[in-house]
């Protein structure tokens, strides 16, 4: 039941975060983009989408750890569940106006991907 509740949250989050990211995608001309390094970038869409996902997960499952591409990892112990998030998987295509990007969310426990 506990895993099902996480799966249900994940499903809802993908829709909510996807809608937020799509709003930015539809308004690319006003999007702020920064370089994270050689051939690596982050946009305000990445950051804000990850913050949304992270806050919803923390509210529902405060005992779980979080690893986000943009915000990093929270404290994590062996056996603890961890959410692994790439808020906009495919930032380069996203900022280039190409539609081959997505919101990626996984939940891992005991080194096994649960979903």
Tell me what each language-model feature is:
Residues 77-115:
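DPxDG-like acidic metal-binding loop motif
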């Amino acid at each position: 039941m506990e895993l099902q509740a996480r799966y249900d949250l994940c499903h809802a989050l993908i829709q909510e975060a996807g809608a937020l990211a799509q709003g930015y995608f539809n308004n690319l001309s006003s999007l702020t983009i920064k370089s994270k390094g050689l051939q690596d970038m982050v946009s305000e869409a990445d950051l804000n989408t990850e913050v949304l996902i992270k806050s919803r997960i923390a509210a529902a499952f405060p005992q779980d750890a979080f690893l986000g591409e943009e915000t990093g990892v929270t404290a994590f112990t062996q056996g603890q569940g961890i959410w692994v998030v790439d808020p906009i998987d495919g930032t380069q295509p996203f900022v280039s106006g190409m539609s081959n990007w997505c919101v990626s969310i996984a939940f891992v426990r005991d080194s096994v991907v649960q979903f």
